[in-house]
Design a protein with these regions (language model features):
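C-terminal interaction-tip segments
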Residues: 1-41, 102-104, 110-126
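Extended, low-complexity, turn-rich repeat/linker tracts enriched in Gly/Pro/Ser/Thr and Asp/Glu
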Residues: 51-59, 113-117
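Extended extracellular/luminal ectodomain segments enriched in beta-structured repeat modules
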Residues: 38-46, 55
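Short proline/glycine- and polar residue-rich coil/turn motifs
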Residues: 78-87
Length: 126
């Protein structure tokens, strides 16, 4: 145990575009890798999900992957939205994440419907 506080040494942003429908909740099927931990581990402070077009009601699933198995971490409900000049596309922004992930772990994502989303994780490497 360290006698001094440990802070992220360098900021890090991970981004993936997902679009392959995956109805599985068990971590199998197509998952996009959003953020991978550095050699000394990493932390994730914020997760943003943004649709790139029209969405139907569905779910974005976030997983913690330990290098072998993906474990469901969170689900984000997606609203049906048709973006236009006056209507914004679907967006989810969680600024209260605070996940610490060790070396070899990653954050992964999937979409229940075949619609394109950009999944962004912001944090830092130790």
């Amino acid at each position: 145990m360290s006698t001094t506080p440990q802070y992220a040494a360098s900021p890090k942003t991970g981004i993936v575009a997902i679009s392959t429908a995956n109805a599985n909740r068990d971590g199998t099927g197509t998952l996009g890798t959003v953020f991978t931990a550095a050699a000394n581990g990493s932390r994730i402070d914020r997760i943003i999900v943004t649709a790139t077009g029209t969405t139907t009601a569905g779910t974005i699933r976030l997983y913690i992957h330990n290098g072998t198995t993906a474990y469901l971490y969170d689900e984000v409900s997606v609203d049906a939205i048709t973006p236009s000049g006056t209507v914004s596309a679907f967006r989810y922004d969680n600024t209260n994440v605070n996940i610490t992930i060790p070396t070899g772990y990653s954050l992964r994502a999937s979409t229940a419907n075949a619609e394109t989303f950009n999944v962004i994780a912001m944090g830092g490497d130790y």
